[in-house]
């Protein structure tokens, strides 16, 4: 293991010898205390007390490089306890060394004149063995339905940045008669959760994140975020749901640069014994700034053309980026199929677990139709029609993929239908949706069972 990072080698050995750090209900639990409610403690009230700072152990739980300064920048605090009043009794949940409780102050609306600010707290219990109970909010009814975490902090950074830039601009005598034009921040990062966001912050970048992995970013949300940054990155999880949602977002907002975490990450196990999948998991193994910069270098948008204004002709020049073009095609399921028995390229399109054999002209047709459906300008449509980067020869370089077309394992049998797949074993039947299936087996389109499954 001399070629591995130290943390990576430790986790690899732990996996080999089945050494786990799984959450344990008998260990990872709060100190519960119940007392009669006082007269001023009404039923339904949530109580809490915040600590002055986070302990080193608590910071390590949040991320390998997270500091007190990072936590404060995103308004995270450690709670001594949280309490809930019900039936004239207060149930206090005290944090322990093996069960930290964190709270984030979330700004909804800043104070204006005599109107006080509107805010709520997000309660986070990361070591709760029951994952569905890790989050709660207080007070009731204050959190907006479509709240974007980190956006108020991003706006504050934008204001601070432009305040400094404007002061420097006005200090220069050459700008005496010129108006200052506000500048955007370089980038922000959509993260898949609280700890991923803190890890991004610990690297010196600005994170934003949603209250659910299935949150659908609206056009209005996207435009609001882009008021403040030049480039928006997304760091999805690399489990099945994360890949599906990351792909959907990349194709809905084609300027977003997606950072796909490396596949080797899933070969390591987390505290629950499941494959590692998120950015914090990556940071535990590769925590240097250089490691993150390498991921940023590989990030691409689904937008596969770029435009540059030509000062001589006073017109826009348009070009296709071949790397982004092939990435766009992969996002839409287009690959070349590895076949040792054939010297010619076989093009395929994968939809869920169903594979269709296609020709290069089908790929060109897809892009032409997509351009029309997306209402791209005539200049871009002509660029697509005339580009040699969509020729048969160029498409020979489409990413090659190897697929498993067997419909069984040593203990399961698979049946593929148009709308879903069924995995049958001695213990039962598991249904896999057409989009988001965890099956790593595929079927040719002509071999799909033509039956509608209820």
Q: Each PLM stretch: what is its role?
A:
Residues 7, 54-55, 64, 193, ...:
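Generic non-transmembrane alpha-helix signal with a bias for helix starts/N-cap capping motifs
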Residues 9-58:
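Conserved active-site segments centered on acidic
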Residues 15, 23-36, 69-93:
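Short linear loop/turn motifs
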Residues 61, 294-454:
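N-terminal nucleic-acid engagement/recognition segments and initiation subdomains in replication
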């Amino acid at each position: 293991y001399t070629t591995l990072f130290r943390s990576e080698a430790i986790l690899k050995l732990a996996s080999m010898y089945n050494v786990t750090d799984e959450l344990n209900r008998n260990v990872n639990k709060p100190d519960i205390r119940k007392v009669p409610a006082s007269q001023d403690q009404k039923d339904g009230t949530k109580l809490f007390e915040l600590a002055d700072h986070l302990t080193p152990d608590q910071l390590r739980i949040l991320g390998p490089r997270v500091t007190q300064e990072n936590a404060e920048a995103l308004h995270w605090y450690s709670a001594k306890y949280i309490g809930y009043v019900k039936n004239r009794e207060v149930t206090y949940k005290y944090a322990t060394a093996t069960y930290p409780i964190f709270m984030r102050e979330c700004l909804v609306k800043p104070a204006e004149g005599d109107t006080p600010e509107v805010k709520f707290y997000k309660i986070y219990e990361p070591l709760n063995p029951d994952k569905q109970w890790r989050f709660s909010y207080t007070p009731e009814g204050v959190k907006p339905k479509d709240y974007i975490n980190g956006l108020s902090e991003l706006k504050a950074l934008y204001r601070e940045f432009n305040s400094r830039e404007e002061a420097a601009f006005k200090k220069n005598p050459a700008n005496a008669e010129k108006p200052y034009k506000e500048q955007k921040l370089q980038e922000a990062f959509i993260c898949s959760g609280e700890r991923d966001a803190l890890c991004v912050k610990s690297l010196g970048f600005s994170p934003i994140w949603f209250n659910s992995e299935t949150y659908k970013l609206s056009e209005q949300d996207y435009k609001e975020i882009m008021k403040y940054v030049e480039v928006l990155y997304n760091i999805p999880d690399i489990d099945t749901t994360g890949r599906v949602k990351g792909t959907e977002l990349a194709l809905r907002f084609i300027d977003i640069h997606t950072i796909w975490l490396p596949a080797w990450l899933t070969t390591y196990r987390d505290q629950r014994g499941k494959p590692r999948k998120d950015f914090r998991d990556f940071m535990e193994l590769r925590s240097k700034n250089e490691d993150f910069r390498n991921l940023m270098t590989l990030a691409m948008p689904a937008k596969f053309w770029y435009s540059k204004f030509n000062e001589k002709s006073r017109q826009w020049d348009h070009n296709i980026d071949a790397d982004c073009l092939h990435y766009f095609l992969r996002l839409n399921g287009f690959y070349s199929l590895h076949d040792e028995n054939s010297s010619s390229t076989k093009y395929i399109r994968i939809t869920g677990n169903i594979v269709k054999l296609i020709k290069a002209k089908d790929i060109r047709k897809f892009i032409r139709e997509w351009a029309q459906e997306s209402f791209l300008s005539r200049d871009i449509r002509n660029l697509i029609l005339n580009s040699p980067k969509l020729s048969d020869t160029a498409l020979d370089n489409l990413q090659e993929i190897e697929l498993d077309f067997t419909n069984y394992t040593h203990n399961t049998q698979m049946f593929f239908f148009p709308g879903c797949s069924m995995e049958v074993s001695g213990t039962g039947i598991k249904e896999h949706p057409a989009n988001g299936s965890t099956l790593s087996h595929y079927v040719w389109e002509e071999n799909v069972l033509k039956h509608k499954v209820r």
